[in-house]
Amino acid sequence: MFNLLKPFYPLVLTAAKSNPEGAHLQLLNTLNTLERTHHTRGGNWLLSQLDQSFCVDDSRLKQTLWGLTFNNPVGLAAGCDKEGIAAGIWSHLGFGFAELGAVTLHPQPGNPRPRLFRLPHDKAVLNRLGANNQGAEIMAQTLAEIWQRSPRNIPIGINLCKSKITPLDEAAQDYVGSFSYLENQADYFVVNVSSPNTPGLRSLQEGEQLNSILQALQAANQHQKPLFVKISPDLEEEAILTIIELAQTHCLAGIIATNTTIKRDRLTTQILPETGNKIQEEAGGISGLPIRDRSTEIIGFIYQKTQGKLPIIGVGGIFTPDDAWNKIIAGASLLQLYTGWIYQGPWIIPDIVRGLGDKLKQLGLSHISQAVGINHK
């Protein structure tokens, strides 16, 4: 059913261009309504149609990592479902896992609008949302209600960010506060110290500050939930090595590479039409195709420096099966995407999943784990 709509998706993108944030919120609310009504005859039928259109079953892509089962390696990146209101639906759209948030301990409205811009010539998005969300306590309530109605049938992660009002020297307590509310509502957690849209946040990637955050979180992590750190694509090698060392010291599950970039050097867009300003003057992080190669480069660097012993979730600029494959052979065990999903619609997930299966067949590999880091073997 939904495959019949694919030719019309560019029209949807065009219609939503004037208000991308509003269109996205409308989509999330629609998915939330579907989740709430899934037990009805009509809702159950719609979910079955989603499953038929977007879910691909391939045992060669199934992995168990950190005690969690991933039916395929393609996950939803943080930033899409900030409040977790569609948490019960992402599995029906073909994702192997989903990361919710970013969420902060304290509710915050984010930055002034407009704050989300599509750069179609670059297949990119400029976002300066500012971690707008209702706070960790409300998200915990939302997810508890969803899990009562819908099974948690894919691994769910939550991206934790520091509240804007919290001083940098109190960041550790802020992250722990969010974790305490949400610990029972997700399968893994991510320490976001790399968003460019919270003042000073990126400084928390530095050794001493990140050390205190990870130490506090692991002390609070009584159930040993897998804990990751998400890093910036703008880091130099020395800074990445420091984070690798801390990740190993604090027994992190892995590293997510990477978040958005503040660099503008790979953009063809020079003027932001919505404001008339030069793109270099516009605050915010760039996601999508412009960070594809840099994120893949960092994945390879981490894999080589850790000899493949620290798992990597690769994210940034995935639009095609080749993009996904290149991150896997560079060293990523799992993948995430969001911007590609916006530009190409939900069909991108089954396309990539099938494409990964085709790659395995071409190389005579029997399982996706055999391809991880194969560039360095």
From Swiss-Prot:
What is the recorded membrane topology of this protein? Peripheral membrane protein
Q: How the cofactor binds, per note?
A: Binds 1 FMN per subunit.
Q: Where in the cell is it found?
A: Cell membrane
Q: Where is the active site?
A: 195 (nucleophile)
Give the molecular function GO annotations.
dihydroorotate dehydrogenase (quinone) activity
- What is an example of a Pfam family matching this protein? DHO_dh
Q: Which cofactor is recorded for it?
A: FMN
Q: What is this protein called?
A: Dihydroorotate dehydrogenase (quinone)
